[in-house]
Swiss-Prot record:
The record marks 116-117 as: Cleavage. InterPro entries: Fusion_F0_Paramyxovir. The inactive precursor F0 is glycosylated and proteolytically cleaved into F1 and F2 to be functionally active. The cleavage is mediated by cellular proteases during the transport and maturation of the polypeptide. This is Fusion glycoprotein F0. It is found in: Virion membrane; Host cell membrane. GO terms for cellular component: host cell plasma membrane; membrane; viral envelope; virion membrane. Residues 32-500 are extracellular. GO terms for biological process: fusion of virus membrane with host plasma membrane; symbiont entry into host cell. Glycans are attached at residues 85, 191, 366, 447, 471. Residues 142-170, 466-491 form a coiled coil. Residues 117-141 are annotated as: Fusion peptide. The chain crosses the membrane at residues 501-521.
Length: 553
């Protein structure tokens, strides 16, 4: 197949606002209307808002792993804290060593820097092979080197504070928030309560909470064991480390509550460890967030197709999987540059492909313009749930209604059946029981038939069969041509020359003229002969009358 033309829109930061303003001038329209398409086996499964993003925002989380106990309770919690401290050091020291090796690999010499940089990466990978993601992570780690050094200068003050969350701004080039999940626990349980606890109970509570946090740390840094410092931390891992205090950093970086859940689901918020200090048990993580530009008038519509019944067999509609609509323009959307969530689509660039007039007309509601392929087999899932109702091909599967009892039949020539709560309350399909709560109102087109001219061949086997038929037709045509040539070869070429043809034409015209003249003369003679016969008959009759008159006298 030939390459398709496409519209490629890169989205550097300076173009985000310009693109958003341009698209905001276009008239807002409703999404693609799936009601006339459902009965043709084309189902609109949902819409997503289209956003463009670049990963440009960064901030730092300074995780305070070791909490400060109140003075009167330090002795009680000493044993579990010391055991916890030793376990932390054992667990995170390889991570800290790897971070230092990579950061120290930066030198002033360009060529030597590259060699030492790559060597540091490969030396920290267990298998000895550095992937592109690991190189990117190591590059980000080196870029955060100065910020990590600034944080280390403040480590004593960070470790000494009893605050669970506070901003660190002294000498830092980017926003940094110090958080302590364990400090939050200590503050809630011991500092901010008047309840007196005995020493044994304090040790038990602290020990249990520290063990739980160690389990979370082991889960978070499990991938770092095989490849220290080069594996990005997910947003879920960051929340495990920082607890609810993670929201403070995200809010400071400009992530609104309406975007937070969507961004968390997208996986675009990631973190890279940039420092670990075993003396104060300080862990620094650089968090990367995307700069998101929302395109208010642009949405992505997802389409699914069902295997429908046609007079040529089962077929599936030839439509794009995802289309985008801005105003009255509908084009196919390439989602390979996008990350999707339940409600949003985040793309580094917008790439669309124009559709043929036939597909455009089809998606606009003219189902007679839709084309179908016979590539779908009988084992294809012949039904789909849509808003509490079901669209099913009841010729491929048995549509058994349990309430009220009965079998739903599909009319001859009908592509699919639209089944809602008005026709069946409880539906059974291939052993799956569904309780229907939705309905297809009068705006849904029903009883759509697929014409033979709408079904084309696209599968490899079918194309081979059709090509065989074409070859047979061509062979038959060649045989007919050979017969014609053999007959033409028997014709005397001299008789078909130009002068001979002119002579034939002149003689033919002369013959026609003589023929016409002869015909006219013959007609004239016949007419004259008939006139003479009439005259003789009249004379004979008169003579007979005279003879009769004489005889009577």
């Amino acid at each position: 197949m030939g390459s398709r033309s496409s519209t490629r829109i890169p989205v550097p930061l300076m173009l985000i606002i310009r693109t958003a303003l341009t698209l905001s001038c276009i008239r807002l329209t409703s999404s693609l209307d799936g009601r006339p398409l459902a009965a043709a086996g084309i189902v609109v499964t949902g819409d997503k808002a289209v956003n463009i993003y670049t990963s440009s925002q960064t901030g730092s989380i300074i995780v305070k792993l070791l909490p400060n106990m109140p003075k009167d309770k330090e002795v009680c919690a000493k044993a579990p804290l010391e055991a916890y401290n030793r376990t932390l050091t054992t667990l995170l020291t390889p991570l800290g060593d790897s971070i230092r090796r990579i950061q120290e690999s930066v030198t002033t010499s360009g060529g030597r820097r590259q060699r030492r940089f790559i060597g540091a990466i490969i030396g920290s990978v267990a298998l000895g092979v550095a992937t592109a993601a690991q190189i990117t992570a190591a590059s980000a780690l080196i870029q955060a080197n100065q910020n990590a050094a600034n944080i280390l200068r403040l480590k004593e003050s960070i470790a000494a504070t009893n605050e669970a969350v506070h901003e660190v701004t002294d000498g830092l080039s980017q926003l940094a928030v110090a958080v302590g999940k364990m400090q939050q626990f200590v503050n809630d349980q011991f500092n901010n309560t008047a309840q007196e606890l005995d020493c044994i109970k304090i040790a038990q509570q602290v020990g249990v909470e520290l063990n739980l946090y160690l389990t979370e740390l082991t889960t978070v840094f499990g991938p770092q064991i095989t490849s220290p410092a080069l594996t990005q931390l997910t947003i879920q891992a960051l929340y495990n480390l920082a607890g609810g205090n993670m929201d403070y950093l995200l809010t400071k970086l400009g992530v609104g509550n309406n975007q937070l859940s969507s961004l968390i689901g997208s996986g675009l918020i990631t973190g890279n460890p940039i420092l670990y200090d075993s003396q104060t048990q300080i862990l620094g993580i650089q968090v990367t967030l995307p700069s998101v530009g929302n395109l208010n008038n642009m949405r992505a519509t997802y389409l699914e197709t069902l295997s429908v019944s046609t007079t040529k067999g089962f077929a599936s509609a030839l439509v794009p999987k995802v289309v985008t609509q801005v105003g009255s323009v509908i084009e196919e959307l390439d989602t390979s540059y996008c990350i999707g969530t339940d409600l949003d689509l985040y793309c580094t660039r917008i790439v669309t492909f124009p559709m043929s007039p036939g597909i455009y007309s089809c998606l606009s509601g003219n189902t007679s313009a839709c084309m179908y392929s016979k590539t779908e087999g009988a084992l294809t899932t012949p039904y789909m749930a849509l808003k509490g109702s079901v669209i099913a091909n009841c010729k491929l599967t048995t549509c058994r209604c349990a309430d009220p009892p009965g079998i739903i039949s599909q009319n001859y020539g009908e592509a699919v059946s639209l089944i809602d709560r008005h026709s069946c309350n409880v539906l059974s399909l291939d052993g799956i029981t569904l309780r229907l709560s939705g309905e297809f109102d009068a705006t849904y087109q029903k009883n759509i038939s697929i014409l033979d001219s709408q079904v084309i061949v696209t599968g490899n086997l079918d194309i081979s069969t059709e090509l065989g038929n074409v070859n047979n037709s061509i062979s038959n045509a060649l045989n007919k041509l050979e017969e014609s040539n053999s007959k033409l070869d028997k014709v005397n070429v001299k008789l078909t020359s130009t002068s001979a043809l002119i002579t034939y034409i002149v003689l033919t015209v002369i013959s026609l003229v003589f023929g016409v003249l002869s015909l006219v003369l013959a007609c004239y003679l016949m007419y004259k002969q008939k006139a003479q016969q009439k005259t003789l008959l009249w004379l004979g009759n008169n003579t007979l009358d005279q003879m009769r008159a004489t005889t009577k006298i």
